[in-house]
Amino acid sequence: MPPAERRGPRLLILPAADRCVGWTLRAANGRQLGAGVRTYRSEDELAEAVRELIIERAALRCTVGQSEGRLWVWTAHLPVRSTRPGAGEAVAVARSARGYLRRDQCQAAVEAFLTGLQWIGQELRRSGGRRPW
């Protein structure tokens, strides 16, 4: 099936302040599944961070909690890569794109995000490492 016919989640690159870029993951129906926490100086830097996120997705630790507005939100963290004692805590790499009224809705959004990452990873492999976004 040609890539143009595949329907699945898409990673979108978004312009940010100071000529930086960020990313968001959207479902095939356009619903936001999650967004990157930080911005990047270039699309190449962003692509490298996304590749690392896809490769390391099994190590992601997702936390669910309530925001100040009493909505449920999630954050995905990657562990710090260091053997030094006290090297720091896990690094936040993605977050929910919106707040949810119920905890179970938020947890389902985490699962949808992780499934979307898996899809993007499969597309990356199918494309031979070329950016599918």
Briefly describe each language-model feature range:
Residues 97-133:
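Mixed-charge, glycine-accented linear interaction segment located at domain edges/termini
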Residues 33, 50-53, 93, 113:
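A compositionally biased, intrinsically disordered/low-complexity signal enriched
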Residues 31-43, 85-104:
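A short, exposed loop/beta-hairpin motif centered on an aromatic-Gly-Thr core
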Residues 1-18, 22, 35-71, 79-85, ...:
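Short N-terminal "domain-start" leader segments
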Residues 17, 28-29:
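Short, ordered coil/turn segments that flank beta-strands lining enzyme active or ligand-binding pockets
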